[in-house]
Amino acid sequence: MQPVESSAIEAAGYDPAEQILALRFTGGATYLYYEVPPEVFDDLLAAESTGRFVNGIVKPRFRAVAL
C-alpha cells in the first residue's frame, strides 16, 4: 500500500494479477474491492479528490469486503 492525500483514506494498494484494490481508511478499516481494472487504480491515484473518486466510482461499482 502507498499513502494517498485524503482526509478519509490513508493508503491504497493494487494487485494487478487479481485486480484487487485495497483501501485503508483513516479510522483504521481496510476494504478490498474486487474486479477493479488497472486504469481505475491509476485514475484513483491521479484524482483531485481521492475520497470523492472512491465514493463516486469505486464504492458504487465494485464488490467490497472488509478485513
From Swiss-Prot:
| Top-rank taxon, per record | Bacteria
The protein's name:
Protein Tpau_2998
Its taxonomic placement starts with: Bacteria, Bacillati, Actinomycetota, Actinomycetes, Mycobacteriales
